[in-house]
Amino acid sequence: MKFDRFSSPLGQPYVAEIEDVPLYHYLPGDSVLVLEVPGCPLRCPYCDRPLLARSQDWSPYDPARLAAAVESLGSQPGFAGVAWSGGEPSLHWDNVVECSRKVHQAGKKVVLATNGGVTAELLRDSPETVDALLVRFKGFSDETYRTLGSPAGLLENSRALVERAIDAGIHVELMLDIARDTPAQGQEFSAMLAWIAQDLRRGIPLHLRAIAPEHGFAIHHGPVTPFLENLVESGRRQHVGFVYLSNCHGHFFNNTMCPNCYSVIVDRTTRPLDLSFVTDGICGNCGTDVGLTLDKETP
């Protein structure tokens, strides 16, 4: 299906796995229509979408035409709804809210990835806009954010957004950029784990995105170092039950393991996903609630 009748000059929307957002604990195995928007408050030297981040060549999505596309795709098994990404969706919030309302009227879900520009206040004023949220952290210190040209308070805004979303019953997952083998990044990772353990809840998914600033892009298929593997192991062991290397495709650390019995309950090294080891979010081996929201139509 072509979507050019409602897309922006940036490019057409496209259908992707919800794992590509990435969201691993919300409707795993389902697909979403990805809506990209331009602009970003940060200036990351390793940005893998610099044209999108800087582009001003954009026009709002047409809500009625988007709704028609969603209704057409809705007949496909496992189609969940739309995913706002980019870019920073908060820069076009009125369009996001208007379009998301149409998607919900069509009986589908809305997920959104943000660098922290979506504030707790925006979420409070538009409580039914988003069903699931990925909050992307570029580090976990004000110093790191300053080096990326961040507006003042963006890290604190991101933390407040996560807490507000959880309180509102929105599904939340987190992402942290990791410059590989950098001790300072390891320290920020530990600080983020402590925040999750103290102020949030054990079991919230945390995605590590491996980056290589010297190459100027995020690593999608590069080798995984012992440093990264140690971070995942320590996170799973100490504070957070679910830590993933989400952009290192095919790695064992993309799998969802039960934090109690350590069984692999979602294997992401193969397609389609095998969800036979989890029922209603419960580990099929030991009965532990692993916090997965499953598509009720999933066989």
Predicted regions and their residues:
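Iron-sulfur (Fe-S) cluster-binding segments and ferredoxin-like electron-carrier domains
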Residues: M1-F6, R49-S59, I265-P272, V290-E297
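Conserved Radical SAM active-site core
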Residues: K2-A132
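Hydrophobic faces of well-ordered beta-strands that scaffold small-molecule active sites
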Residues: L33, V82, V110-L112, L133-V135, ...
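Short glycine-enriched, charge-decorated loop/helix-capping segments at active-site entrances
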Residues: L51-Q56, T147-A152, H220-H221
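Conserved glycine-rich "GG(E/T)P / GGGxP" loop and the immediately following alpha-helix
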Residues: G74-K102, T144-A160, I166, L176-M192, ...
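Short, well-ordered coil/turn segments that N-cap beta-strands
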Residues: G78-A80, A106-K108, T129-D131, A168-V172, ...
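Conserved radical SAM core fold
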Residues: P89-L91, G117-L123, A132-P151, H171-P183, ...
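Auxiliary Fe-S-binding modules of radical SAM enzymes
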Residues: D167, R180-P299
